[in-house]
Amino acid sequence: MLFSTKAEYGVRLMVELGRQPGSRPVSLNAIADAERLPLSYLEHLVAKLRQAGLVTSTRGAHGGYRLAHPAEEITMIEVVEALEGPIAPMECFHETPEGKVLCSHADEVDRTCATKLLWTRVQGGVNRALAGTTLAELVEFSRPAEERQPAVGSAA
């Protein structure tokens, strides 16, 4: 499964916002410069993140964007789905509002899709990894090794 640059750049944008001390607003120009990303593309991404309630904006000379919630409360599945839409390992997959995964190939023949089990497991693994990773973890991981906080339960 490949994610597009929307997910990659959007996660990098969110990490940059998470690095800011005191949750002060950050301009998209500053993020574009820090991450070497195209400003026009970031404008498109931040609109999706704002619509999803993950970032807020402040107008004015010292305005910009900031996280709408603490980094510890933002999971990567929220970020990726805000940018990419529902996560599906194959184009033939779609999820019902009840969360049931359906395969369009199952309609073509009078039997269950032969590979649905495999792709459902792939989707579940990806979703668990994204849901189990917070923005705070990525912010901490992005720091130089000597500045990182020890992980909970690790030897100091």
Where are these regions (language model features)?
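Non-DNA-binding regulatory cores of transcription-related proteins
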Residues: 70-156
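Short alpha-helical segments that sit at the start of domains
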Residues: 1-14
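Beta-hairpin "wing" of winged helix-turn-helix
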Residues: 54-62, 66-68
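A short alpha-helical element within helix-turn-helix/winged-helix DNA-binding domains
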Residues: 28-36
